From Swiss-Prot:
Pathway: Metabolic intermediate biosynthesis; chorismate biosynthesis; chorismate from D-erythrose 4-phosphate and phosphoenolpyruvate: step 4/7. The keyword Cell cycle does not apply. NADP(+) binds at residues 131-135, 223, 246. This is Shikimate dehydrogenase (NADP(+)). The active site is at 70 (proton acceptor). GO terms for molecular function: NADP binding; shikimate 3-dehydrogenase (NADP+) activity.
Protein backbone atom coordinates (compact mmCIF):
# COMPACT_ATOMS: atom_id res chain seq x y z
CA UNK A 1 0.00 0.00 0.00
CA UNK A 2 1.21 3.51 -0.83
CA UNK A 3 1.42 5.75 2.24
CA UNK A 4 2.81 9.18 3.05
CA UNK A 5 6.18 7.48 3.72
CA UNK A 6 6.39 5.62 0.39
CA UNK A 7 9.54 6.36 -1.63
CA UNK A 8 8.68 6.96 -5.27
CA UNK A 9 10.66 5.87 -8.32
CA UNK A 10 9.55 5.53 -11.92
CA UNK A 11 10.16 5.48 -15.64
CA UNK A 12 10.51 8.43 -18.03
CA UNK A 13 9.90 7.56 -21.69
CA UNK A 14 7.60 8.15 -24.66
CA UNK A 15 5.63 5.96 -25.08
CA UNK A 16 5.65 3.83 -21.89
CA UNK A 17 2.34 1.95 -22.01
CA UNK A 18 4.05 -1.26 -23.20
CA UNK A 19 6.65 -1.28 -20.39
CA UNK A 20 7.13 -4.34 -18.16
CA UNK A 21 9.16 -2.28 -15.66
CA UNK A 22 6.35 -1.15 -13.29
CA UNK A 23 5.11 -4.73 -12.83
CA UNK A 24 8.66 -6.04 -12.35
CA UNK A 25 9.78 -3.39 -9.85
CA UNK A 26 6.57 -3.24 -7.81
CA UNK A 27 6.67 -7.03 -7.45
CA UNK A 28 10.27 -6.72 -6.24
CA UNK A 29 9.34 -4.01 -3.73
CA UNK A 30 6.50 -6.16 -2.36
CA UNK A 31 8.80 -9.18 -2.13
CA UNK A 32 11.46 -7.28 -0.17
CA UNK A 33 9.04 -5.30 2.00
CA UNK A 34 10.72 -2.03 1.04
CA UNK A 35 8.48 1.04 1.16
CA UNK A 36 8.92 1.91 -2.52
CA UNK A 37 6.50 2.26 -5.44
CA UNK A 38 7.23 2.49 -9.18
CA UNK A 39 5.17 4.38 -11.79
CA UNK A 40 5.56 4.93 -15.54
CA UNK A 41 5.49 8.55 -16.75
CA UNK A 42 4.86 9.28 -20.44
CA UNK A 43 7.13 12.30 -20.92
CA UNK A 44 7.16 14.00 -24.32
CA UNK A 45 10.59 15.32 -25.39
CA UNK A 46 9.63 18.99 -24.97
CA UNK A 47 8.62 18.28 -21.34
CA UNK A 48 11.75 16.39 -20.29
CA UNK A 49 13.42 19.32 -18.54
CA UNK A 50 10.28 19.98 -16.48
CA UNK A 51 10.03 16.28 -15.64
CA UNK A 52 13.64 16.25 -14.39
CA UNK A 53 12.88 19.30 -12.24
CA UNK A 54 9.94 17.27 -10.93
CA UNK A 55 12.30 14.56 -9.63
CA UNK A 56 13.85 17.20 -7.38
CA UNK A 57 10.62 19.00 -6.50
CA UNK A 58 8.69 15.83 -5.59
CA UNK A 59 11.57 14.07 -3.88
CA UNK A 60 11.64 10.98 -6.10
CA UNK A 61 14.45 8.55 -5.19
CA UNK A 62 15.26 8.02 -8.84
CA UNK A 63 14.01 7.01 -12.25
CA UNK A 64 14.66 4.73 -15.18
CA UNK A 65 15.06 6.43 -18.54
CA UNK A 66 14.05 4.88 -21.84
CA UNK A 67 13.59 5.92 -25.48
CA UNK A 68 13.77 8.74 -26.53
CA UNK A 69 15.37 10.39 -23.48
CA UNK A 70 18.55 8.36 -22.74
CA UNK A 71 20.88 10.90 -24.35
CA UNK A 72 18.82 14.10 -24.01
CA UNK A 73 18.63 13.79 -20.21
CA UNK A 74 22.41 13.79 -19.68
CA UNK A 75 23.05 17.58 -19.60
CA UNK A 76 20.15 17.98 -17.14
CA UNK A 77 21.87 15.86 -14.46
CA UNK A 78 24.46 16.91 -11.87
CA UNK A 79 26.84 14.01 -12.43
CA UNK A 80 27.30 11.14 -14.90
CA UNK A 81 28.90 7.84 -13.93
CA UNK A 82 32.10 7.18 -15.99
CA UNK A 83 30.69 4.08 -17.75
CA UNK A 84 27.48 5.94 -18.71
CA UNK A 85 29.65 8.79 -20.03
CA UNK A 86 31.60 6.38 -22.24
CA UNK A 87 28.42 4.70 -23.47
CA UNK A 88 26.91 8.13 -24.13
CA UNK A 89 23.52 7.32 -22.62
CA UNK A 90 21.80 7.11 -19.23
CA UNK A 91 19.09 4.60 -18.31
CA UNK A 92 18.98 5.12 -14.52
CA UNK A 93 19.01 8.27 -12.39
CA UNK A 94 19.61 8.25 -8.63
CA UNK A 95 18.73 11.20 -6.40
CA UNK A 96 21.42 11.35 -3.73
CA UNK A 97 21.89 14.25 -1.28
CA UNK A 98 20.01 16.61 -3.59
CA UNK A 99 22.12 15.65 -6.62
CA UNK A 100 20.90 13.70 -9.65
CA UNK A 101 23.43 11.10 -10.80
CA UNK A 102 23.10 9.27 -14.13
CA UNK A 103 24.09 5.63 -14.63
CA UNK A 104 23.80 3.08 -17.41
CA UNK A 105 22.94 -0.42 -16.14
CA UNK A 106 22.22 -1.91 -19.59
CA UNK A 107 25.74 -3.19 -20.24
CA UNK A 108 26.36 -4.60 -16.76
CA UNK A 109 22.83 -6.06 -16.76
CA UNK A 110 23.72 -7.84 -19.98
CA UNK A 111 27.08 -9.12 -18.74
CA UNK A 112 25.66 -10.28 -15.41
CA UNK A 113 22.94 -12.32 -17.14
CA UNK A 114 25.27 -13.71 -19.81
CA UNK A 115 27.79 -15.00 -17.26
CA UNK A 116 25.14 -16.32 -14.84
CA UNK A 117 23.12 -18.11 -17.52
CA UNK A 118 25.88 -19.54 -19.73
CA UNK A 119 28.96 -19.76 -17.46
CA UNK A 120 30.96 -18.04 -20.21
CA UNK A 121 34.52 -16.84 -19.43
CA UNK A 122 34.63 -13.35 -20.92
CA UNK A 123 38.42 -13.07 -21.13
CA UNK A 124 38.50 -15.86 -23.75
CA UNK A 125 35.83 -14.44 -26.06
CA UNK A 126 36.14 -13.23 -29.64
CA UNK A 127 32.86 -11.35 -30.07
CA UNK A 128 30.92 -10.58 -33.24
CA UNK A 129 28.15 -8.09 -32.63
CA UNK A 130 25.29 -7.26 -35.02
CA UNK A 131 24.26 -3.61 -34.68
CA UNK A 132 25.90 -0.35 -33.61
CA UNK A 133 23.05 1.54 -31.90
CA UNK A 134 22.49 2.44 -28.26
CA UNK A 135 22.18 -1.14 -26.99
CA UNK A 136 25.30 -2.14 -28.94
CA UNK A 137 27.27 0.73 -27.37
CA UNK A 138 26.26 -0.30 -23.85
CA UNK A 139 27.13 -3.96 -24.45
CA UNK A 140 30.37 -3.29 -26.37
CA UNK A 141 31.87 -0.88 -23.82
CA UNK A 142 31.00 -3.15 -20.91
CA UNK A 143 32.38 -6.28 -22.61
CA UNK A 144 35.55 -4.34 -23.47
CA UNK A 145 35.98 -3.26 -19.85
CA UNK A 146 35.43 -6.87 -18.75
CA UNK A 147 38.39 -7.92 -20.90
CA UNK A 148 37.10 -9.79 -23.96
CA UNK A 149 39.80 -10.55 -26.56
CA UNK A 150 38.32 -8.79 -29.58
CA UNK A 151 35.08 -7.21 -30.81
CA UNK A 152 33.87 -7.29 -34.43
CA UNK A 153 30.94 -5.15 -35.56
CA UNK A 154 28.46 -5.97 -38.34
CA UNK A 155 26.19 -3.03 -39.15
CA UNK A 156 24.22 -1.73 -42.14
CA UNK A 157 25.63 1.78 -41.65
CA UNK A 158 29.42 1.54 -41.88
CA UNK A 159 29.74 5.10 -40.58
CA UNK A 160 27.95 4.26 -37.32
CA UNK A 161 30.00 1.07 -36.92
CA UNK A 162 33.21 3.07 -37.48
CA UNK A 163 32.36 5.51 -34.66
CA UNK A 164 31.67 2.65 -32.24
CA UNK A 165 34.78 0.72 -33.34
CA UNK A 166 36.96 3.79 -32.84
CA UNK A 167 35.68 4.41 -29.30
CA UNK A 168 35.65 0.79 -28.12
CA UNK A 169 38.98 0.22 -29.87
CA UNK A 170 40.65 2.42 -27.25
CA UNK A 171 39.97 -0.37 -24.73
CA UNK A 172 40.14 -3.61 -26.73
CA UNK A 173 40.95 -4.56 -30.37
CA UNK A 174 37.80 -3.73 -32.38
CA UNK A 175 37.12 -3.93 -36.11
CA UNK A 176 34.32 -3.39 -38.60
CA UNK A 177 33.15 -6.44 -40.51
CA UNK A 178 32.94 -5.31 -44.14
CA UNK A 179 30.13 -6.36 -46.47
CA UNK A 180 30.65 -9.95 -47.58
CA UNK A 181 32.90 -10.80 -44.60
CA UNK A 182 30.17 -11.68 -42.07
CA UNK A 183 30.37 -15.45 -42.43
CA UNK A 184 34.17 -15.48 -42.06
CA UNK A 185 34.01 -13.19 -39.00
CA UNK A 186 31.50 -15.46 -37.25
CA UNK A 187 33.38 -18.65 -38.25
CA UNK A 188 36.19 -18.01 -35.76
CA UNK A 189 34.16 -16.06 -33.18
CA UNK A 190 33.07 -17.64 -29.90
CA UNK A 191 30.26 -15.19 -28.99
CA UNK A 192 27.65 -13.78 -31.39
CA UNK A 193 25.34 -11.02 -30.13
CA UNK A 194 22.30 -9.54 -31.87
CA UNK A 195 21.73 -6.01 -30.53
CA UNK A 196 19.21 -5.04 -33.25
CA UNK A 197 15.42 -5.39 -33.32
CA UNK A 198 15.56 -7.91 -36.20
CA UNK A 199 13.39 -10.86 -35.17
CA UNK A 200 11.31 -8.99 -32.58
CA UNK A 201 7.52 -9.39 -32.54
CA UNK A 202 5.69 -9.16 -34.88
CA UNK A 203 8.54 -9.87 -37.36
CA UNK A 204 9.42 -13.25 -35.88
CA UNK A 205 10.45 -14.81 -39.22
CA UNK A 206 13.34 -12.35 -39.60
CA UNK A 207 16.88 -13.12 -38.46
CA UNK A 208 20.01 -10.93 -38.48
CA UNK A 209 22.31 -13.81 -39.48
CA UNK A 210 21.73 -16.70 -41.93
CA UNK A 211 21.53 -20.10 -40.21
CA UNK A 212 24.44 -21.43 -42.31
CA UNK A 213 26.78 -18.90 -40.69
CA UNK A 214 26.21 -20.38 -37.22
CA UNK A 215 28.33 -23.16 -35.70
CA UNK A 216 28.20 -25.33 -32.59
CA UNK A 217 31.21 -23.61 -30.99
CA UNK A 218 29.27 -20.35 -30.60
CA UNK A 219 27.39 -18.84 -27.74
CA UNK A 220 24.55 -17.02 -29.53
CA UNK A 221 23.00 -14.17 -27.56
CA UNK A 222 19.96 -12.12 -28.59
CA UNK A 223 18.97 -8.95 -26.72
CA UNK A 224 15.34 -9.41 -27.84
CA UNK A 225 13.06 -10.92 -25.18
CA UNK A 226 9.75 -10.81 -27.05
CA UNK A 227 9.54 -13.51 -28.38
CA UNK A 228 11.49 -15.35 -25.69
CA UNK A 229 13.16 -17.48 -28.37
CA UNK A 230 13.82 -15.67 -31.64
CA UNK A 231 14.41 -17.38 -34.96
CA UNK A 232 18.14 -16.72 -34.47
CA UNK A 233 18.14 -18.58 -31.14
CA UNK A 234 16.01 -21.47 -32.50
CA UNK A 235 18.43 -21.97 -35.39
CA UNK A 236 21.44 -21.71 -33.06
CA UNK A 237 19.96 -24.26 -30.66
CA UNK A 238 19.24 -26.62 -33.57
CA UNK A 239 22.93 -26.80 -34.54
CA UNK A 240 24.13 -27.28 -30.95
CA UNK A 241 25.23 -23.75 -30.05
CA UNK A 242 24.72 -22.33 -26.54
CA UNK A 243 21.86 -19.80 -26.55
CA UNK A 244 21.11 -16.78 -24.35
CA UNK A 245 17.90 -14.71 -24.60
CA UNK A 246 17.34 -11.04 -23.83
CA UNK A 247 15.12 -11.50 -20.78
CA UNK A 248 18.15 -11.81 -18.48
CA UNK A 249 19.51 -8.44 -19.61
CA UNK A 250 16.14 -6.77 -19.06
CA UNK A 251 15.76 -8.25 -15.56
CA UNK A 252 19.34 -7.55 -14.53
CA UNK A 253 19.46 -3.96 -15.78
CA UNK A 254 16.34 -3.44 -13.64
CA UNK A 255 17.89 -5.28 -10.70
CA UNK A 256 20.98 -3.05 -10.82
CA UNK A 257 18.75 0.06 -10.86
CA UNK A 258 16.80 -1.38 -7.89
CA UNK A 259 20.10 -1.83 -6.01
CA UNK A 260 21.25 1.72 -6.82
CA UNK A 261 17.98 3.19 -5.49
CA UNK A 262 17.54 1.02 -2.39
CA UNK A 263 21.01 -0.18 -1.39
CA UNK A 264 19.48 -3.67 -1.08
CA UNK A 265 19.98 -6.79 -3.19
CA UNK A 266 17.27 -7.23 -5.82
CA UNK A 267 15.14 -10.42 -5.84
CA UNK A 268 16.06 -11.28 -9.44
CA UNK A 269 14.30 -14.66 -9.41
CA UNK A 270 10.94 -13.06 -8.57
CA UNK A 271 11.54 -10.25 -11.07
CA UNK A 272 12.31 -12.71 -13.85
CA UNK A 273 9.26 -14.84 -13.06
CA UNK A 274 6.79 -11.94 -13.18
CA UNK A 275 8.19 -10.73 -16.52
CA UNK A 276 8.00 -14.26 -17.95
CA UNK A 277 4.37 -14.58 -16.83
CA UNK A 278 3.49 -11.23 -18.38
CA UNK A 279 5.20 -12.08 -21.67
CA UNK A 280 3.41 -15.42 -21.89
CA UNK A 281 0.07 -13.58 -21.51
CA UNK A 282 0.85 -11.19 -24.34
CA UNK A 283 2.41 -13.62 -26.85
Amino acid sequence: MITSKTQLVGLFGHPVSHSQSPMMHNTAFLETGLGFAYAAFDVEPENLEDAVAGIRALGLKGINVTIPHKVAIMPMLDEIDPLAKRIGAVNTVVSRDGRLIGYNTDGMGYVRSLVEETGIVLEKQVVTMVGAGGAARAVAFTLAEQGVKEIRIINRSRERAAVLAEHVGMIVPTKIVEQGEGEAAIADSSLLINTTSIGMLPNVQETPVPAEWLHSGLTVSDLIYNPLETRLLKEARAIGATVHSGIGMFVNQGALAFELWTGEQAPTGVMREVVLQQLKKTT
